[in-house]
Design a protein with these regions (language model features):
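N-terminal topogenic module of multi-pass integral membrane proteins
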Residues: 1-40, 44-56
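Structural signature of hydrophobic alpha-helical transmembrane segments
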Residues: 1-10, 36, 55-69, 113-125
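Helix-coil boundary and interhelical linker segments in multi-pass alpha-helical membrane proteins
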Residues: 1-4, 48-58, 103-116, 161-172
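C-terminal ends of transmembrane helices
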Residues: 14-24, 47, 71-85, 130-141, ...
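Cytoplasmic-side transmembrane-helix entry/capping segments in multi-pass membrane proteins
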Residues: 29-37, 59-64, 85-96, 120, ...
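Short, structured motif recognition centered on aromatic/hydrophobic residues
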Residues: 33-37, 44-50, 119, 123, ...
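Small-residue-rich segments of transmembrane alpha-helices in multi-pass membrane proteins
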Residues: 35-43, 91-105, 123-124, 147-160, ...
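Ordered, amphipathic secondary-structure segments that act as subunit-interaction surfaces
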Residues: 69-106
């Protein structure tokens, strides 16, 4: 179950990365690199931290192939992206929610304590975006006042709470994916941020 869910999450995040690369006028190869970094960066770091070696992308070619399909989809679907920036934001928000739940579930399967599961959920969700923004020569969203990591953290805590209530795991994943997506989109829509004052 985790394998197929992760492939879907990789696809969604890689589309986000590829479109972000296209915003910077990158060619297909550049879009692919940024797509791979976005789709697989967070999961790879998570695997390194929990000792899941080698990381899945080096054990199964499906991950890189899915990223390639995502980039083709992003590149040739470009005529339909009337506002690429908005599409990137929406797709990125959806992938955040998916990756938080994925990182937490994989960490739970490794028997990690609850707080480590939440940390790994945030890392899985956010680190690909960090690499994407670095590749685009931008300050990563997570290091700005954007409600980004906070949304991931909140979603992770809610997921653990739903688990404690005995809710079916799949339902919990669906709920927090929607929750994190909505938080991010509201933050973008209404320019909500975390004040440094």
């Amino acid at each position: 179950m985790n394998f197929y869910f992760e492939l879907v999450a990789v696809f969604v995040a890689a589309v986000s990365g590829a479109l972000a690369g296209r915003q910077k006028d990158m060619d297909f190869f550049g879009m692919y690199v940024v797509g791979v970094l976005t789709g697989l960066g967070g999961g790879t770091l998570r695997s390194l931290l929990i000792g899941d070696l080698p990381p899945p992308m080096f054990r199964n070619p499906s991950y890189l192939l899915v990223a390639a399909v995502a980039v083709v989809f992003a590149r040739f679907g470009e005529p339909w992206w009337s506002k690429i920036r908005r599409v990137v934001s929406v797709v990125d928000a959806v992938s955040l929610g998916m990756f938080v739940s994925l990182g937490i579930r994989i960490s739970q399967a490794k028997g990690l304590p609850w707080w480590a599961c939440v940390v790994n959920g945030v890392i899985t969700a956010a680190f690909g975006g960090v690499l994407r923004d670095i590749a685009r020569v931008e300050v990563p969203l997570i290091f700005r006042r954007e409600i980004y990591a906070t949304a991931c953290l909140a979603g992770g805590m809610v997921l653990l709470g739903l688990d404690a209530l005995g809710l079916p795991k799949g339902i919990g994943v669906l709920i927090i994916t929607v929750l994190i997506t909505v938080i991010r989109l509201l933050a973008i829509r209404y320019s909500l941020n975390q004040s440094s004052d």
